[in-house]
Amino acid sequence: MRVVIQRVKASRVEVDGEVIGTIGRGLNLLVGISRTDTIAEVEWMVRKCLDLRLFPDEKGSLALSVQEMGAELLVVSQFTLYGDGRKGRRPSFDRAAGGEQAQTLYDRFVAGLRQSGLRVETGQFGAMMEVFILNDGPVTLLLEREAPLEQEDNRDD
C-alpha cells in the first residue's frame, strides 16, 4: 500500500465539474493499493496517517499530528501510484490491485480514518477526478507498506 501525504491549507476533488469532497487545513491522501495488500497494511497505514507529526507547534517544529490538530482529511484513490515506468514508454500497472479488491481495502482505509472522529472527505473511487491541492510548506511524504510476500526490508512500526 502506498499513500502520498500532503499537508494542505485546502484541497478539493471534482468529478465532471462537481465538487464531491473539500477540506480546509489538513492532509490530502493519495492512496494506491497493491494486489498483495491485506487488512494488515490498511490498519498500519491508518495509524501512520493519523499519528505522523506533520504540523508545526508554536516553535515551528513538526510536532503535531492531524489528530492533535483536529484537522481534516481528503482521501483520493490513485492506482497510478503502482505504475512502473522502467520498461518501454507506457507504464505497467501489474502491481496495482484489481478494482474489487482495491475498493474493498480503500473503503476499509477510509472507515479506519473516520473512526478517529476527524472530518474525512473522499473522491469517487474509479472515477476520473480533478484534485486541487493548496500545499502547506510544502510537506509531502510517501508512505509505503508492502505485504510480507513482497517485503524486502524489515518492517518499521
From Swiss-Prot:
Q: Which Pfam families match?
A: Tyr_Deacylase
Localization (cell): Cytoplasm
Q: Does the keyword Chaperone apply?
A: no
Matching InterPro entries: Daa-tRNA_deacyls_DTD (IPR003732), DTD-like_sf (IPR023509)
Please give the chief subcellular localization of this protein: cytoplasm
Q: Which reaction does it catalyse?
A: glycyl-tRNA(Ala) + H2O = tRNA(Ala) + glycine + H(+); a D-aminoacyl-tRNA + H2O = a tRNA + a D-alpha-amino acid + H(+)
GO biological process annotation, one example: D-amino acid catabolic process
* Keyword hit for Cytoplasm: yes
User: What's the EC number here?
Assistant: 3.1.1.96
Q: Where is this motif: Gly-cisPro motif, important for rejection of L-amino acids?
A: 137-138
This protein's GO cellular component annotations are: cytoplasm
Subunit comment for this entry? Homodimer.
Q: What is known of its domains?
A: A Gly-cisPro motif from one monomer fits into the active site of the other monomer to allow specific chiral rejection of L-amino acids.
Q: What does this protein do?
A: An aminoacyl-tRNA editing enzyme that deacylates mischarged D-aminoacyl-tRNAs. Also deacylates mischarged glycyl-tRNA(Ala), protecting cells against glycine mischarging by AlaRS. Acts via tRNA-based rather than protein-based catalysis; rejects L-amino acids rather than detecting D-amino acids in the active site. By recycling D-aminoacyl-tRNA to D-amino acids and free tRNA molecules, this enzyme counteracts the toxicity associated with the formation of D-aminoacyl-tRNA entities in vivo and helps enforce protein L-homochirality.
This one is known as D-aminoacyl-tRNA deacylase
Q: Which organism is the protein's source?
A: Cyanothece sp. (strain PCC 7425 / ATCC 29141)
Q: What gene, per UniProt, encodes this protein?
A: dtd
